[in-house]
């Protein structure tokens, strides 16, 4: 159902059971999957792809051109997976180079005032709390959680099942399964609570803890830590 005060470009492809509230504007080559709800005053730009059963709250701007001086009008996309919620005033820019894309996976929650810049790849089941700012070319693994008002530097890789505390400045890669805190960023142990919530068996969590302690707490260099893990902590 589409409200009469909504503008939809004739080139947009929208599933028949999508609900779009008033004063939303949809430009150009846009695709929206079935069961999705688009709130009022949302702007969806050319090149945006939205999956099934998503919820887009008022004020969001999706698929705007990248904030990158080298962009020169190439055909790029911003792609949002199924069952993802985009809260108020979130901005997601599309990719930069020809056929480039910004991608947000399935079952994600992107809270109010967050920004996802060009060419990011956000995995499935990720959560960004309010006002998280993610710079370009960031990769985020599945089940990552980023606390509010955190900033993520461009080209950073964030591993799966990580937890980043609110207000952190993420200026370096964050390995999988761990907690990252403070500014400057430091690693704060294994994300045991998150792993338990996601059904990891206790034996597996303890193995991850042993590996973490070997790498970060025993005083080994990287080669020594890897050798110790292979010999003493077989998977």
Q: Where are the model-predicted features located?
A:
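Structural signal for interior beta-strand "rungs" in well-ordered beta-sheet cores
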Residues: 2-186
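SDR active-site lid
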Residues: 184-202
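An accessory alpha-helical subdomain
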Residues: 197-235
